[in-house]
Amino acid sequence: QKKAGRETKEGIIGSYVHTNNKIGVLIEVNTESDFVARNDEFKELVKNLTLQITAADPRWVDKESVPEETLAQEREIYKEQFKNKPPAVIDKILEGKMQDFYKANVLLEQTFIRDEEITVKEYIESKIGKLGENIKVKRFVKYELGE
């Protein structure tokens, strides 16, 4: 059975409060066993994800979490910006703009801040390979004082 299809019912809640005490992040990261959840490498992954969220400010975990209404609004904005272009060109531009939107707003699609050669998704996949269990980011929340 592929790791990606296996259930993740264990895990930890990670937290990070920025040194200025004005930004805090909570994240739930799940894995298949308590054994992996207690592993230092897994804990490091969770810590790195909280730092990623603090620095890069994603709004959603994965592409599937982005509301269809938000995607439709983004597409309309881009279509309006490029309405004088031929339809085939608009489609290509739209595709690129939506990829940029995902990279800016979706945690798993973002460039990993500790290694800009890979995405957060690729970083997690590398840890799945090392730890031998499926790992899923379930949810996160970022708090900013005054926001």
Regions found by a protein language model. Give the residues of each.
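N-terminal assembly/interaction segments in proteins that build large macromolecular machines
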Residues: Q1-E147
